[in-house]
Regions:
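Conserved C-terminal beta-signal and adjacent last beta-strands/turns
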Residues: 140, 154, 202, 283, ...
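Outer-membrane beta-barrel signature, preferentially recognizing the C-terminal barrel domain
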Residues: 73-77, 160-227, 247-274, 279-282, ...
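Flexible glycine-rich, low-complexity coil/linker segments exposed to the extracellular/periplasmic environment
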Residues: 9-73, 182-191, 237-264, 339
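Short loop/turn motifs that connect adjacent beta-strands in outer-membrane beta-barrel proteins
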Residues: 1, 10-12, 93-100, 147-149, ...
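Extracellular loop and loop/strand-boundary signature of outer-membrane beta-barrel proteins
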Residues: 69-75, 122-129, 190-194, 259-265, ...
């Protein structure tokens, strides 16, 4: 049995900045001037760069707090989760071969609530909304040894992934219309959804492993996940009678149901994929290659998931293809390795204005890292026993991070190469 209680709060104070000599203009003083920044990647050329934070701090701007219009950006979300676990080990014989594994089940009871503001024009009403649900998550894992070096593994499990806490906040903006919407409601709103529940998946995994040497193995894994209750942008209906009573607003027919545009559970689909991996000491090929080795893997993934309206949907963070390769050399405490990872384009989340989270297309990348190190444990130098020194190089090809919105560059960042020199000592 376990219990977890977590709370997330967002406090957003937004100010409108007005230059203190407005409507006159002011040249940027030299002490704040930082040069220029190149914006060629979005077709804007060079742009002035200056220390705007310092200018605010030194009183060049008058700040006006925008309380009402940004009140819905402030909220708190709490979540209490009680979990019960049970597991039993399995040991049996199938077709003359030993099969081991375990079977288990997890029951979770979740109580969540959110306190936030509802807004309509200049009217603000603080509200607390609660929601509770439960989940039952069974699992089965089996392992069959074909011989001393070959193994087959099988797993099936129901899993879940909780919504982001900011998606469950109780804040929204309300508008009352004289004409009903497609749902027959006169009230429209936009904001969070306090009734969001976890995304669910039923996953099946099958893996073949071949340990052909002490430090070598080959493996191929196949997997399939049935996805349900995925979270999309959509519409839900909620009762806003408390808000209407507090503000004195009414609808033409006296109804109190609002159509809220935000995140909703709905739609389902499948995720299928495979992974092939190989680890091999090259001394298996020739004794002159003693100490050399490789590790390589390739992952391929495809998904078929539909939004509630039937449109195709791309899962965030999912690249259709990922390759990774490492070459290493180890000998007498010395170790060197070079790794390269390549992934295709994928969808991802970035913070937008007001710290809202928005989804964009992230371009694929190829990143190379390297490391050399020496462990003095086997050096024969007594006072250096336990010392290990290393030099790391990260992003050696200076791969940029690029995101697109509608085919136009949204964000472009160059991190440059990163080198680290360090040591560790075991007493």
């Amino acid at each position: 049995v376990s219990f977890r209680d977590r709370t997330k709060k967002k406090t957003a104070e937004n100010y409108f900045m007005t230059l203190n000599v407005f409507p006159d203009m002011l040249a940027v003083p030299d002490k704040y001037y930082l040069g220029s920044v190149n914006l060629d990647f979005i077709g804007m050329g060079n742009m002035i760069a200056y220390d705007s934070v310092a200018m605010v701090r030194d009183g060049f701007y008058d700040l006006t707090l925008e309380e009402s219009s940004y009140a819905t950006n402030q909220w708190s979300v709490s979540e209490e989760v009680t979990a019960f676990y049970a597991m039993a080990n399995l040991e049996m014989e199938v077709a003359g071969r030993e099969v081991t594994g375990n079977v288990g089940v997890r029951y979770l009871q979740t109580d969540q609530s959110s306190t936030a503001f509802a807004r309509s024009g200049g009217d603000l009403v603080q509200q607390t909304v609660s929601h509770d649900y439960n989940n039952v998550l069974p699992s089965l894992n089996l392992r069959m040894a074909l011989d001393e070096q070959q193994t087959i593994r099988f797993g099936i499990a129901k899993t879940m992934s909780r919504p982001r806490m900011d998606e469950m906040n109780a804040s929204f903006s309300i508008g009352v219309s004289q004409v009903p919407d497609v749902y027959g409601n006169y009230i429209g709103a936009g904001g969070g959804n306090t009734t969001l529940e976890p995304k669910e998946a039923l996953g099946i995994d099958l893996t073949y492993e071949n340990y052909f040497a002490d430090d070598g193995y080959f493996a191929i894994a196949l997997y399939r996940k049935e996805l349900k209750e995925w979270i999309f942008d959509g519409a839900a209906e909620i009762d806003v009678s408390n808000f209407l009573a507090a503000t004195g607003q009414t609808t033409p027919d006296g109804s109190t149901t609002a159509t809220v545009n935000g995140k909703v559970n709905g739609g389902d689909g499948t995720l299928t994929g495979y992974e092939v991996s190989l680890a091999m000491p090259l001394s298996l090929l020739h004794e002159s290659l003693d100490g050399w080795g490789i590790f390589a893997s390739h992952t391929g993934v495809s998904s078929d998931i539909k939004a509630p309206g039937g449109a195709d949907f791309e899962l965030p963070g999912l690249s259709k293809s990922i390759q990774q390769a490492t070459v290493y050399y180890e000998n007498g405490g010395f170790e060197a390795r070079l790794s390269v990872r390549k992934r295709d384009d994928f969808k991802g989340d970035l913070y937008g204005l007001g710290f809202s989270v928005e989804q964009y297309e992230m371009l694929g990348e190829t990143i190379a890292d390297a490391q050399i190190s020496y462990d003095f444990s086997g050096s024969g130098i007594e006072y250096l026993e336990g010392l290990r020194v290393y030099l790391q190089g990260v992003n050696l090809t200076d791969e940029p991070f690029t995101s697109l919105n509608g085919g136009v560059v949204r964000d472009y960042q160059e991190y440059g190469e990163n080198y680290r020199l360090g040591f560790s000592y075991d007493f």
